[in-house]
Amino acid sequence: MTAAASGAESRLCTFYVGDERYGIDILTVREIQRGPVVTPARGAHRAVRGLVNLRGGVVTVLDPAVQLGYGERELGAKTRLVILKTNAELPRVHGTTLETGDDRVGLCVDRIADVHSVEPGGIDPLPLHVRGSGGLISGVIQLQDEMIRVMDPAAMLRLEEGE
């Protein structure tokens, strides 16, 4: 649950996967890195793009494009890695937890958009007939010219076989 859904203002780190804009609660973001060299992780879940070395530590790279049904894509010059906080780094406000343990996880996105402030009640629930996203999308924000799909990073980390 994001702060905006719970009645407090929140901010989202927004980015693009393909031509669609997504956002995650900025409280879950540790940092953003340029698209690094990714070492494949053979035998891992298909949404695991691979591993990267970030300042001497290993980061597992997830590909939200695969999880969202876009399929695999080439990483480009604008590709960025959104590094999520580990459970130990997360503030305990709003009950935010991620199943990272001590492992660092990053999401490879096509490009970063901006930080978007969300007023209380500014996130609409998904319509009933589009809730089949496996819980990856928790709601939408309607802007004048586009929508931001709000991702649940905890759901993204629950990699299940057969997806």
What does each model-found stretch correspond to?
Residues M1-E163:
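An acidic, low-aromatic, low-complexity terminal/linker signal
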